[in-house]
A protein has these predicted regions:
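N-terminal strand-loop-strand
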Residues: 1-31, 42, 56-61
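Short, charged/polar surface micro-motifs in flexible loops or helix N-caps
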Residues: 11-13, 22-24, 36-37, 65-68, ...
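Short acidic, gly/pro-rich beta-turn/loop elements at beta-sheet edges
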Residues: 15, 54-55, 115-118
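Nudix hydrolase/Nudix homology domain
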Residues: 23-27, 87-184
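The catalytic Nudix box helix
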Residues: 30-81
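Conserved short secondary-structure elements within globular domains
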Residues: 84
Length: 184
């Protein structure tokens, strides 16, 4: 079972960047990972934000919670639904088809400066406009940086590497379109 978090840091959202499994592009992946022990979803997301980007995070209550099927994450049908667990409510909950597993994704803020950890190749610090650009056309890491994009890179990533948005970046874009108040 996994959990993730969209962290707002000075109007930007840190996402991990690194080679995809096939080595054909640079995947853009949300902060998050597998739960450990008896962690809640929020505890996992907060720990992963710290482990991957050195961010101490504070939860932001979402305007609502959306559910979707993870198998359709590129073009999911999202619907509002209640979060019945105690504690912090997520903005998104991905349900895995034919399994009881869920992946909650939370909203958070941080005053810290993101720093990629030893397990993170790099971080892109994405503005809402940059997210829209990455989703609307093919762009390389070099083009992103030349256009003023912000990145913190630990590894030597190829500047000609095509940026590949993973589903959670598309989902964040949709959420920001529906709820621009999240940015304030």
């Amino acid at each position: 079972v996994t959990a993730g978090v969209y962290v707002r840091v000075q109007g930007r959202f840190p996402f991990q960047i690194g080679p995809n499994r096939a080595g054909t592009a640079l995947g853009i992946v949300r902060l998050g990972g597998h739960r450990e022990g008896g962690e809640t979803g929020w505890q996992c997301a907060a720990r992963e934000a710290y482990e991957e980007a050195s961010l101490q995070v504070s939860p932001v209550p979402p305007p609502t919670t959306y559910w979707y099927e993870t198998a359709a994450a590129d073009t999911p049908a999202l619907f509002e639904g209640a979060w019945l667990e105690e504690g912090v409510a997520p903005i998104l909950i991905g349900r895995h088809l034919n399994r009881h597993n869920m992946t909650p994704i939370y909203l958070a803020v941080s005053q810290d400066k993101p720093v990629p950890s030893h397990e993170t190749k790099g971080l892109l610090l994405l503005s809402p406009e940059e997210i829209s650009t990455i989703l609307s056309k093919e762009i390389t890491l070099g083009q992103y940086l030349d256009a003023g994009g912000k990145a913190l890179l630990r590894a030597d990533l190829p500047l000609n590497g095509r940026l590949e948005p993973f589903p959670h970046l598309r989902l964040l874009h949709w959420v920001l379109t529906q709820h621009p108040e999240i940015l304030s």
